[in-house]
């Protein structure tokens, strides 16, 4: 510390030497020229390459982002289209099912009407046959009754007996 104080007292540091300034500046300029010739070019080219690399990475990132957005939009469009197509298919299937149900219902109603009409026709035919048979039987019985009446002279008791006999015969012939 003592030596520092002596140098300060002598004015060595506060009075710069012009020769020392010249040689220091000259050395600095020489080092600067040497560095410019040897190191400055590679440093700048390395910085430029690094800047190009960073810009290229940024460009690739933007391109990838744009492609991803395009793919996302395409996928959304495809999904919307698929949803619309699915809705259309479901709607068409419901329409076909409703039409098929209506057709089957109409066919079933037609078939039941035919069966009912056929059954009514059969019933009507059976009714006519039964009435024909009944008329024939009644006519036969009336003829037989008339024959009996004609053969004998009837009083009131005999008439009742003949009618009762005819009723019994009709009941027996039906069974």
UniProtKB/Swiss-Prot annotation:
Transmembrane regions: 14-34
Location(s) in or outside the cell: Cell inner membrane
Cellular-component GO terms for this entry: plasma membrane; proton-transporting ATP synthase complex
Pfam families: ATP-synt_B (PF00430)
Primary location recorded for the protein, binned into one broad class: membrane
Membrane topology category: Single-pass membrane protein
InterPro entries: ATP_synth_B-like_membr_sf (IPR028987), ATP_synth_b/b'su_bac/chlpt (IPR002146), ATP_synth_F0_bsu_bac (IPR005864), ATP_synthase_B_chain (IPR050059)
Highest rank taxon of the organism: Bacteria
Molecular function terms from GO: proton-transporting ATP synthase activity, rotational mechanism; proton-transporting ATPase activity, rotational mechanism
Keyword field: ATP synthesis, Cell inner membrane, Cell membrane, CF(0), Hydrogen ion transport, Ion transport, Membrane, Transmembrane, Transmembrane helix, Transport
CDD domains: ATP-synt_Fo_b (cd06503)
Cited HAMAP family: ATP_synth_b_bprime
Family statement: Belongs to the ATPase B chain family.
Assembly mode: F-type ATPases have 2 components, F(1) - the catalytic core - and F(0) - the membrane proton channel. F(1) has five subunits: alpha(3), beta(3), gamma(1), delta(1), epsilon(1). F(0) has four main subunits: a(1), b(2) and c(10-14). The alpha and beta chains form an alternating ring which encloses part of the gamma chain. F(1) is attached to F(0) by a central stalk formed by the gamma and epsilon chains, while a peripheral stalk is formed by the delta and b chains.
Protein role: F(1)F(0) ATP synthase produces ATP from ADP in the presence of a proton or sodium gradient. F-type ATPases consist of two structural domains, F(1) containing the extramembraneous catalytic core and F(0) containing the membrane proton channel, linked together by a central stalk and a peripheral stalk. During catalysis, ATP synthesis in the catalytic domain of F(1) is coupled via a rotary mechanism of the central stalk subunits to proton translocation.
Protein name per its UniProtKB record: ATP synthase subunit b
